[in-house]
Each structure stands twice: as structure tokens, then as C-alpha cells.
Amino acid sequence: MINNELKDIFSSNDFNSKTWINNLLSDCGGSGSSSGNAKSNQQSILTDQNNIKAELEIENICSNYLSKLQLYQIELNISLESITSESLLIVPKSIREVDRIRKESLHLKNRIKSISSKIGEMNNDSPQSMETVSVIEKLDQVKSRMEISIRSLKEAEKLLSFSKTVDQLFSSNDYLMISDKLEEVKQSLSVLSDVPEFREQSKKFNVYQDRLESQLKQPLQQSLQQKDLESCKNYLKIFTNIQRQDKFFIYYYQVRIDPLKLLWNSYSSSSSSSSSSSNFHNWLSKFYDEVLVMINSEFNWLSGLCPIDYIQVLENLIIHLFTTINPNVQSRIDQAITIANQTTQQPIKVNELLSIYKTTCSFLKSLSPIFPNIINSSSTPTTSPAVDKLFKVIFEPYKYFQNKFSEYEIKSVKSQLQSISPILTLQKKSGGGSGGSGNADFTNIIKNIENQFIPKSFQIAQQSIERFFDFTHTTDIDSYVNTVLNQIFTEISLILRDTINELKFITGLTTNYIIGSSGTFPNFNQQQQQINTPSSINGEVDPVKKLTNSHTRSHSRSGSGSGNSNSNSVGTSATLQNWEYFQGAMNLLQSIHQLLNKFQQFDNSTSLNIIHYLGNSNNSNNSSSNNDNDQFICNIRKFLLGKDLNKIQKLQISVQNLENIISSPLPLSSSSSVSKDQSISKKPLLLQESFNQISKLLSISQHFVYETLIYFIKLKLKELPKIVSNEWNNNNNNNNNPSQNNGGGGGGGLSYISQITDHLLTIPQQLDPYSEEELTRFSLSTSLQYPIKTCSNSEDDFYQNLLIQYQREKQFDDEQLLIEKLKEKQEQQQEQQEKEQQQEKEQQDADQDININTNNNNENDENDEDDELEDGIAHQWITIVAKATEKLYLQTIVEIITLNEPSCQQLSNDIGYLFNVLSALGVSAEPLLQKTQSLLEMNRDTFTSFYHQQLHNNNNNNNNNNGNSNNNNNNTNNISLLTNAEKNICNLIGKMRNIK
């Protein structure tokens, strides 16, 4: 064990014998002096024995080391002696060589001097030197000509020999030897090209080459078919020798693509037995698989045939294949994507076209392991022309469809939209519908718009964008945006317009239809005859006859009866509003608002997605996993754009417009509905035309809500002239004191105005569920910017004038409120300044805090002002309906033919009652209607005097206008304060009251 330990110690690389011996001796000395007791003596004895053994081992090892060292020393001495002796022998030889080289350099130097001196002598202009040079030059020319002649004679001899043995040579079938001989003949002909006698041989040489090629054709094709690599190598060498290497590869391409050509041509017979639309797509995928099998096989085989440029040969093989089949590709794709028995109105199968195209892209990507430049960022037209040819030959048939993509896509999308539009049409029933079927259809259509049509429409639009990315790679943004995207939302708007016309037809509330998708106003001839029937609509009860108990209200004016004389009034035909139609119209308005909001998000996301798509595919430094795919798309885009500067410039302009749209700052939002709409319209949009169409649809939806609210009032006011002429005037003529009798005509008047006011007072209850729904807010700016166009121009003008008047009044009220707020602010600021001046300078820090709080309060005050300027949703609608009611009331009064005095008082009381209700609703009275009331409440004598004064004033004005009077009438009567409209009302009332 000790021996093993010692071996380990001495065999280590860092063993130091001197240090180890000293350490061992020191340990032995220390252990001998430390024995004190019996136990320690025993241990020391054992230790001594071990030390003795160790010392013996050390002596043996040391002796061995010493002997080895002595031997090494002897060997080293011997080697040093031998090396030294050899070095001593070499030194004299080296000295002699150095001396020899020195002598040679001196001799060479002397020779150079001698030559330079001779050259100098020859450069002298002596006649002797010039003659010598001339003789030498002539001799050199003679020598060169003799050499050329000798070479020409040898080449001529070769040609003569070849001509004699050419037939025998070709009959030997040693094609390699023939090619070598032809190569020699070619060289000989190049030498003898200036000899006229051998020019005819040059023509024969081409014949010899053709003869050799014709003999090689059949065996070459057999060898290529059998993939005999050695034979093909020999044939390639032969064709290379005769400068016809291209012909060799042409034969190679023909042999390799013939089976694939047969497979390609076999599709016509297979397709005739199958009419499946996906037949060509599936077959093309299998065809590409066969091509890939061939390419992988040839990749390995060609590396043995031509190791240097086999990749280029393989690329040319693929190019030849697709060049051969391309004339039929476009027609087969067109046949595959065309619907059977297609007319010009039917769309093509765009999804099928995209599937075929994606299959081709996948095929080209699968070639990237062999041709890395297909997806390599370094692939450029200058570095890889073969790859560019590969892209061109494979994608060339699709270029036609990519240029027509927008045309195909819009037809397909319109077809998809039309396929989902039946959910918005009236459900036809075989047997007459019940009284509630109209309501059911109305409600279902509204729900389908929100829950199905709008989401599906955006899904269709998003899928169209994805197809645009996948098929055209954004090479023609402008055409797609204008031809497809804008047309999609235009079609959506037209479908919804048709739906609103359907809803109007269902409700029967109006016949003022809007222009539909056909570009004309709809004509519901047969249906309209049923609508005009007072008792039914499509076999259903008139909508205003449908009673809703929860909406029933009872109103009476002070001093009037209970309204028990309604049997002869307009209330006999219709007494209550059907609020289900109003609720549906409000839900429709919400849906259209949601459509507009979604559209704005869609427009923004579309711009971002296009820029993102272009950025990814153009960024060659992208390190994501999709880098290869992005570069592949970029290469396809380069091929599609090519060198067409118009397309490139058009794409650059489109991208610049998109970047401007994205980078444009969002307008500051405001709490005001009007300002919100204006800010939205100022934001540049990609699909501005679509935004206008949807905004127009929003304006139409708001008008539809207005129609559901105003219809009942129109219906009640429509019968007022008949009530006045048939009931009021007759009853009051038979009654000496009509003002105290509320049972006859007065009861009729009470019934109509009471129902109108009941309707107006019910509107806030119906609007209450929508008071917090911003999507039901009336957008005044939208309605003014996008006026409606129905089949009734008078109704359109009435509605637009109503909105303009409402806008003016609202602006005036807002300005007055702002003025009051500014005054309050100024007073508060003055008070604040006075307080700040009174504060001590030591409280400067506190003053700063106060100022900060003051600024925050000012900002909050501004927001509060905006909130105060904004009308509530319910108040908006109530105000519009109330203003319309007043205007309709005026129009109805104008239609009255005659009025007796009690009827005037009755009508004045009705107007006053309406004003009281409007005041309770927070709506100001119409000034012209107020003046009408004041004229009606005058007794006959007072009005007669007033009327005559008005006529007299008009005559004076006419005289002044004709220059017959020098001074204006100084009459300061109230009549001078009448406006033209009020004068017209006064004249009409005078005619009604038969004032002469």
C-alpha cells in the first residue's frame, strides 16, 4: 500500500524531490522528540518502523533516479558532440557557397553593363545601326510567316485526311472520337479561315455536326430515359466538344417533361367525367406533387451529370415544363372558377380561385430547399435571373386574374350580401296574417339587422380583405378600395334602405319611401291599396287602432267635460299610438349608429393592416419566424409590379395616403353630439364614400323615428278642417251661447287636441328607456349634412326646414347660455383676484396650491358648460316633435275654409292648451303660432278693425313702392310690427271669418 502511495507521489508531474525529502526529514525529527509516556512510546515505535521502511524505499527510488540521470547525461553529451562536429563541417561549405554567389552577382552585373552599353550604341542614329535593326525585323517577319505556313500546311493536311476518312469515321460509331476530330477540324478551319479554298469546308463542318447530332439523338434519349449517368456524361462531353451543349439540355428537358405533359393533358378527359368545382384544385395539387417528385429525383441525378451548374439546369427544367403547360393553365382556371350555366350577373368562385393560387404558392415554396433564392432576401433580379424567370413562368397565368380581382370580388361579395338579405324582408304568409303578424315581422327584422345582418356584413368585408392580401399582395390598393370596399358598404346601405322601406310598408305610418337599391322609389301598388284601407294593413288592424293599455292616458282641460262626445270625432277611427313601431325605430337607429361606429373602427384597422402587411413583407431585417414567408410575398409583389412605373407610382401614392390617414391626429372629442359628428367627419378616412353612405343611412333612420312619432299627430290634425266645417261651425250656429257648451263641436275639438297632447306627454315616458343610450341621440349635423330624399318633396322640405330652425334656435340658446356663463366667470375671477391681493406674501406656497386648484376648477367648469349646452336625448326628440307639431298645426289652420266666432275661440283655446303642454315639456312656443292665437282670440269687431288697418298699411306700402307717396305711414299700430308670414296669416284668418 505504501509502495502504491509512493508511486503516486513520485509519478506526479509537479513532484519536487528536494521539497519532499526536506518535509519528510522534518516530520521524522519532530516525531522522535515528542515521546513522553508509554502510549506515546508505542506510537513512536510504530512510526519509526514505518519511517524505516519509507527510508528504504526512498533509497531504492533515489538510486534508480540517479542511475537514470547519469545515463541521460551521457546521452546528452554524446548528441551535443555530434551536432557540434557536424556544424563545424557545414560552416566551410556555407562560406564557399556565399563566395560563389557573390562572384556570380558581380559577373551578372558586368554583363548587364555590357548589354546596356550595346543597346546604347544601337540607339544612336548611325545608318549602320538602323540597317541592322531593319534586317533583324525582316528576318523575324519571314520566320513568323514560315511558321504560319507550316501550321497551315499541317492543318490543311488534317482537313484533307478528315475528308477522306469522314464516312469511315462516322460508320465507326465512336462518337467521342468523332467529336474530338470535329473539334480538331474546327481549329483547322479557324486557322485556314483566310484561305478561299477552305471556305467551303466551313459549310460542310456544320453538316458534319448535324450528322453527328442526328446519330446521337436516339441513343441519347434512351440513356436519358434509363438515367444512365455514365453514358449521359459521355454524350454531354460530345455535345460540349461540338459546341452544342444547349441542344443536349433541350433533349434532356424534353425527355424529363414528356411524362408530366401527358399527365397534364390527361386532365381534360378526367374533368369531363366529373363536374365538381374543386376537381381542378385537387387535380392540380396532385400534379404539383408529381413535379416535386421529379425535381427531387433530378436534383440528385444532375449533381452527378454536371456538378458545377446543376442547380441552373434544374431551374431551366422547371421553366421549360411550365412554359409548355402555361397556354392551358388560364383557361382551366377560368373553367374551374366559373359557375355552370353562368350569366353575366353571376359571380365567379373567388374562394376556389384563391385555393388554386395558394396551392401554386405552396408548390413554389416547397422548392426553397433546392432554390433558396426563392425566399432568400438576397434574391434580386441582378443576382438570380433564373429565379425571376421561375416566378414569372409559374405565376404568369394568375396575373390576368389578379388584375381582374376587384371585379370578381365585388360580384362575389354582392352575391354573399344578397344571400343574407332575405332575413330583412317581410315574411310572406299563405293565409292572411293575424293582427299581430305585422308587429312580429317588424320586430324580427329590427333584431335581424342588429344580431345577424350587420355582424355578417362585417365578416364578409373582413374576409374580402384577407382574400385581397392573399391573392394580390396589395399591389393595387386604390382599385380594391374604390371598386370593392366602398362598394361593399354602399351595397350594405342600399340593402338597409330597402329594409327601411319594408318597415315603412309594414307599419303603414307613411308612404314617403326612400330610393332603394334599384335606384328608384319602391312601388308597393297592391300592398298600398290594402294600406289605404282604413281598417286593415295586409289584413291587419290599422296600427293606430292597436291599443296598448300601458300607454293609455286621460287628459282634460279646465272647464271642459270628460270627453264623452268622441263618437263623432277623429278619435273614432284612431285613438292611440302604437308605440311598438317607435321602439323598433329607436332600436333601428341604435343599430345604424353601431354600424357607423363599427365602420370607423373597420376603416382604421384596414388602413393599419395594409400598412402592417406592406411593412412586414418589405422588411428584410425582420427576425420573426414569418421572415421567409414575408420575403416570398415581397418577391411575388416585385414580379406583379415588374417594371411598370405607373403601377409602382400608383402604389406609392396609395401607401402615402394611408400613412397620412394613420398619422393624422384624432380630433378632440366633445360632449356635444353635434361637435362629435363634426369631429368625426374631419378625420380623414380610407373609405370616405362608404362613410357618406352610412351617414346618409343614419339620417334616414333618424327620419324614420321622427315619422313614427309625428304620424299620430298628422293623423289627428288632418281631420281638423273637416271638424271645424262639419261640427264646430254647425253646432255653434245652432247654439246661441256656444262658449258655455262643451258637448258638441267643443267636445270634438277637445278630443283631437287632447289626444295630441296626450301623445306629446307620452313621448317622455317612451324615451325614458333610451335616455342613457347615446346611440339614440339625434345627430343634427348628420341630418343637415345628409338631407333625406323621399318621394314627397314637400315632406322633405318641411323636415329640413324644421331641422334648420331647430339648429338656429339651439345655437341662439347656447350662445346666450355661454354669455351668462362668461359673465359669471368674470365675476368669479375678479373676486378671486381680490382675495389673492389680500393674501400675505409669506403664504406664496399656499397661493400656488390655490391657483392649481383654481385651474382644475376652471377645467371642470368648462366640461360642465359643455354638458349644459348639450340637450338630453329625450329633450332633443321632444323638441323636434313639438316644433313639427306647431308647424303642422299652422299648416292645418291654413287649410280651414271658414271660421265663425265660437270656432275661433275654440281654436284659440286649443292652441293655448297646446302651449301649456309644450311649456310643461320645456319647449318654447312657435312665434307665428302665438300670433295666430292672438288673432283668433280677438272678437270680431276688434279683429275687423285690426284687419282693415293691415289692409290700409299694405296699400300704403304698395304706394310707397310705386313712388306715389312721399312719406311712409306714421301709424304706430301693432300691425306695423307684423312680419310677412304673420300678415299672410292675418289675411287668411280674415278670409276665414269673412271679413270684408
Swiss-Prot record:
Source organism, top-level taxon: Eukaryota
Disordered: region residues: 533-571, 828-867, 950-974
Membrane topology qualifier: Peripheral membrane protein
Keywords carried by this UniProt record: Golgi apparatus, Membrane, Protein transport, Transport
Keyword Transcription recorded: no
Coiled coil: none
GO BP terms: Golgi organization; intracellular protein transport; retrograde vesicle-mediated transport, Golgi to endoplasmic reticulum
Compositionally biased residues, Basic and acidic residues: 828-844
Subcellular location: Golgi apparatus membrane
Annotated GO CC locations: Golgi membrane; Golgi transport complex
Compositionally biased tracts (Low complexity): 557-571, 849-858, 953-974
Main location, first listed in the record: Golgi
Assembly, per entry: Component of the conserved oligomeric Golgi complex which is composed of eight different subunits and is required for normal Golgi morphology and localization.
Family membership noted in the UniProt record: Belongs to the COG7 family.
Role of this protein: Required for normal Golgi function.
Protein name in UniProt: Conserved oligomeric Golgi complex subunit 7
